[in-house]
């Protein structure tokens, strides 16, 4: 009988899915096409979070902020999971 090795735990981030709470990763967003197409000074709330990931299409996610502002589409690699106090 073979023994199945236990999965190795890694610190890799969990993949984002619809309904996830997210924030924008400033390092990934800086100098991206999306940031260059926006105002020069990005609002702080996108980096503080949380925003809700309401849709995913290919490499992009639609984020809805808890503010009276329009939803935005950003690349998934520019988003990271939001945690309390992050």
UniProtKB/Swiss-Prot annotation:
Location of this chain's protein in the cell: Cellular thylakoid membrane
GO molecular function: oxidoreductase activity, acting on NAD(P)H, quinone or similar compound as acceptor; quinone binding
Enzyme class: translocase
Catalytically driven reaction(s): a plastoquinone + NADH + (n+1) H(+)(in) = a plastoquinol + NAD(+) + n H(+)(out); a plastoquinone + NADPH + (n+1) H(+)(in) = a plastoquinol + NADP(+) + n H(+)(out)
Pfam family, any one: NdhO
Keyword line: Membrane, NAD, NADP, Plastoquinone, Quinone, Thylakoid, Translocase, Transport
Self-association and partners: NDH-1 can be composed of about 15 different subunits; different subcomplexes with different compositions have been identified which probably have different functions.
Family of this protein: Belongs to the complex I NdhO subunit family.
Function: NDH-1 shuttles electrons from an unknown electron donor, via FMN and iron-sulfur (Fe-S) centers, to quinones in the respiratory and/or the photosynthetic chain. The immediate electron acceptor for the enzyme in this species is believed to be plastoquinone. Couples the redox reaction to proton translocation, and thus conserves the redox energy in a proton gradient. Cyanobacterial NDH-1 also plays a role in inorganic carbon-concentration.
Name of this protein: NAD(P)H-quinone oxidoreductase subunit O
Source species: Prochlorococcus marinus (strain SARG / CCMP1375 / SS120)
